[in-house]
Amino acid sequence: MKLSRRDFMKANAAVAAAAAAGLTIPTVAKAVVGETTNAIKWDKAPCRFCGTGCGVLVGTQNGRIVASQGDPDSPVNRGLNCVKGYFLPKIMYGKDRLTQPLLRMKDGQYDKEGDFTPISWEKAFDIMELKFKNALKEKGPTAVGMFGSGQWTVWEGYAASKLLKAGFRSNNLDPNARHCMASSVVGFMRTFGMDEPMGCYDDIEEADAFVLWGSNMAEMHPILWSRMTSRRLTNEHVRIAVLSTFEHRSFELADNPIVFTPQTDLVIMNYIANYIIQNNAVDQGFLDRHVNFRRGATDIGYGLRPTHPLEKAAKNPGSDASEPMSFDDFKAFVAEYTLEKTAKMSGVPEDQLESLAQLYADPKVKLVSYWTMGFNQHTRGVWANNMCYNLHLLTGKISKPGSGPFSLTGQPSACGTAREVGTFSHRLPADMVVTNEKHRQIAETKWQLPAGTIPEKVGLHAVAQDRALKDGTLNAYWVMCNNNMQAGPNINEERMPGWRDPRNFIVVSDPYPTISALAADLILPTAMWVEKEGAYGNAERRTQFWRQQVPAPGEAKSDLWQMVEFAKRFKVEEVWPDELINKKPEYRGKTLYDVLFANNVVNKYPLSEIPADQLNDEARDFGFYIQKGLFEEYADFGRGHGHDLAPFDRYHQERGLRWPVVNGKETLWRYREGFDPFVPKGEDVRFYGKPDGKAVIFALPYEPAAESPDQEYDLWLSTGRVLEHWHTGSMTRRVPELHRAFPEAVLFIHPLDAKARGLRRGDKVKVISRRGEVISLVETRGRNRPPQGLVYMPFFDAAQLVNNLTLDATDPLSKETDFKKCAVKLARVVA
């Protein structure tokens, strides 16, 4: 049975009526399409795009997705979707969808300069096996690596961590979340000893004020923005402040719209801390019971190569050191950040700064701070996170309904996979780290490994992987579920040279021929979204499951299948030294698949637990319920330690649960008695990630950006996204409606800056940095309105690689790239 446009419109109308009446959508759909044998089947899934974690109902028929709706039973989005979410089915069916492995070949053999040629999976794994084994044999575990994703499912990330850190004994595993959430991770760990926000989306309906720091929620998290808009417009007392280096759509609702000079958010936060103290708005009792003060190391560099002049000049490059200080010391430290000084440095009028500070200082105002990439993609991103926590800790506005700091995520499982599973080069599951001997022992015990298997040295982070490929020390490299050739910084100087170096072999697993795929040596076709069973963890600690709903096209396979199947190619003797194998002689002759995935834990759940009519290609390929086995083994890391997850089967019944889940009950606000089961009675608040239960307020100064405009390169460049496209556009640009809505990137520029350079709206313009150049189109109107001296350009357009321009400077503590600040100049392109 086909669903006509008329029927689809009827279904939409019925869905709206059903939502109002409290009926479920599958019931309504049945009424619309009838009880025929090929009627549309509906099932739940979280959205494939940002970290909000909206619920979607997916309609399938005859092995294809034919419809989708916002899930009215989802507490996140309550039946709404953003414009990208409404077109989710179409991301699956681009005309250039990859359906078989492709290898660069010439005259029937692999050739680095050859043409992409279809091959079998067996031959694809043959060449991968050869290249990975050669790298391991010649240079050891540090010669292999993987760049993963905040779009991996929970068990894909967990399998990757086991394969790399245990199997290949290489910590050279990092996710693309390094580019977006690493500063938040380090900030949370530094202040609270545990990662991820303590609050939840319920704060939106409870708060009296919202402050957005470097977050354009209207376009990047539109469903949360709709909830905030409702809160603001239906409650006259509610206020919204928006801070950014340029005006954007979120400014349209702002009561206090603030445009500041890049990097001076650090100054503004220290001013607010000073204001709170000077106006006796400190919650002294809260500080005395729950907070310590520390002074952080300064002049820590910019995460550039050690030979860079800025790194040579830094006194404490990469230092995370700090020393105890008193409240009075902190008071003296922030005293220099006066209203007058802050206004002068930031360019923000004094009355706007004071109005902002009053929101934080007023004890009657419940306030939530939200931030995204403006804070995190920052050479002092960790400091920015710490300084925001300072404001909430000084006032006690934390860990309670309507008040708290909240880092919003940009990918669907940057939290659930990259952070919680621990696919960063320094992390293990449940906030454990490879540098901690006890943590390594815990992982080795749970994974049934010989003691000493997991290396203690931190592996290569995202930017360091690029540098190692260029330097020829990282030689076998697997990129999954991301498009880093387009998304990462400084493409020309630091990434492309390593990828095309004949010493290196690059594998890219992707559903589409992205810039990254086309720069690789081997492309593996990948199943996406509901073509596999999956789990994501969103920004409010909500873990959500979905079942496979359609088969993948052609020979496309999930990332999980690819990694687990590839593990069969390696015997332990080929990857582990004798001293390790001698500790577990029973592993001799076994493959990494046997040791890591057929270990009587991962493979203990039989296929009979999967309904006979339910798709699950991976499980049936391996002969056991692999997703359940991986999840339960992983979940054991956090249970009883404040990272508790519910049993696997519960998630298939729920619209997600926010961890820690204890005795079947989710946790909405962490660290607060009465909400968090890990806070002992009588303590009120306990930040139990720290041994003494106290959070840390850090004294940290303003330090300048790594690169600022000068006489030649006279403009700031900031990069980012637009509503219609997600990241590099590899999915959304294949949706005709989204592509037509915003077909190509433009350079947003102030009209006076354009006029001064002889440029008009629609002109072609060459944007030039010290690292490269790109041609774009001048846009002096529209949704983004930069101040004079700054231009803004989105990075979704593969024909305009804005990251040819960006600098690979990172936060020295989080290793996250600053995509928001570099210097450029413009030149008019004469037709």
Swiss-Prot record:
Report residues binding [4Fe-4S] cluster. Answer: 47, 50, 54, 82
The reactions it catalyses are: 2 Fe(II)-[cytochrome] + nitrate + 2 H(+) = 2 Fe(III)-[cytochrome] + nitrite + H2O
Q: Return the Pfam families for the record.
A: Molybdop_Fe4S4, Molybdopterin, Molydop_binding, TAT_signal
- Cellular component per GO, a single term: nitrate reductase complex
Alphabetical keyword list: 4Fe-4S, Electron transport, Iron, Iron-sulfur, Metal-binding, Molybdenum, Nitrate assimilation, Oxidoreductase, Periplasm, Signal, Transport
Q: Which GO terms describe its molecular function?
A: 4 iron, 4 sulfur cluster binding; electron transfer activity; iron ion binding; molybdenum ion binding; molybdopterin cofactor binding; nitrate reductase (cytochrome) activity
* Note describing how the cofactor binds: Binds 1 [4Fe-4S] cluster.
Q: Which residues are listed for substrate binding in this entry? A: 795
Q: Name one GO biological process term.
A: Mo-molybdopterin cofactor biosynthetic process
Key word Transmembrane present: no
Documented EC number(s): 1.9.6.1
What does the entry's PTM section describe? Predicted to be exported by the Tat system. The position of the signal peptide cleavage has not been experimentally proven.
Cofactor(s) it depends on: [4Fe-4S] cluster; Mo-bis(molybdopterin guanine dinucleotide)
What is its subcellular localisation?
Periplasm
Q: Where is the 4Fe-4S Mo/W bis-MGD-type domain?
A: 40-96
Gene3D superfamilies hit by this protein: 2.40.40.20, 3.30.200.210, 3.40.50.740, Dimethylsulfoxide Reductase, domain 2
Q: Which InterPro entries match?
A: Asp_de-COase-like_dom_sf (IPR009010), CT_Nitrate-R-NapA-like (IPR041957), MoPterin_dinucl-bd_dom (IPR006657), Mopterin_OxRdtase (IPR006656), Mopterin_OxRdtase_4Fe-4S_dom (IPR006963), MopterinOxRdtase_cofactor_BS (IPR027467), Periplasm_NO3_reductase_lsu (IPR010051), Prok_molybdopt-oxidoreductase (IPR050123)
Q: Where is the signal peptide?
A: 1-31
Binding site residues for Mo-bis(molybdopterin guanine dinucleotide):
84, 151, 176, 180, 213-220, 244-248, 263-265, 373, 377, 483, 509-510, 532, 559, 719-728, 803, 820
Protein family: Belongs to the prokaryotic molybdopterin-containing oxidoreductase family. NasA/NapA/NarB subfamily.
What this protein is reported to do is described as:
Catalytic subunit of the periplasmic nitrate reductase complex NapAB. Receives electrons from NapB and catalyzes the reduction of nitrate to nitrite.
What binding partners and quaternary form does the record give?
A: Component of the periplasmic nitrate reductase NapAB complex composed of NapA and NapB.
Question: Which NCBIfam families is this protein grouped with?
Answer: NAPA, PRK13532.1, TAT_signal_seq
| Protein name per its UniProtKB record | Periplasmic nitrate reductase
Q: Which organism is it from?
A: Yersinia enterocolitica serotype O:8 / biotype 1B (strain NCTC 13174 / 8081)
Whichever gene encodes this chain, its name is napA
